[in-house]
């Protein structure tokens, strides 16, 4: 194959060719740029939609943890917490469902939540703090609205509930509140650990479908989600 030694001439020909096709080349460049922008936007929007869908599903089921166990005793929880294969473990202790008439259509579960569990369960207070005193509680704005209670720290209100066949009507002080989600199966009222231990000491065993007051609901994340 013969080689052309005059590089200057080749460059001139190439330059003239580019100038002759200037508009066509410009259109091609614009098409490439627009295609790149389109695919970037497509992947960004698609990723955002997937993330929103996942969050919506998590809110419906009431938690973002990878997995969990229900109705455990304290000793069973401690065994799970020691599992080195897990990245993080947290829990809540069940107490009861609120029974006030205004809450018939706004189901509200009462339980003690660890801070991490509250964050996983979308009930960590947006304003205020987690319960510390025996009569403090955190509630959703939806529960408070149904009860006619303003979302204001320090508000006092009574909640009716039953634990192991015994009825209670207790006055709580609002120490925190969060924005509830209507797609959730239930709203949450976080109460103090002292109250739960007082009214519903953890039993030695629990059976599905039985009385779950005092049982540990344990959630955890694996070291990898794959």
Task: Locate predicted features.
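Basic-flanked hydrophobic alpha-helices used for secretion and membrane insertion
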Residues: 46-226
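N-terminal Sec/SRP start-transfer signal
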Residues: 1-37
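Alpha-helical transmembrane segments
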Residues: 35-46
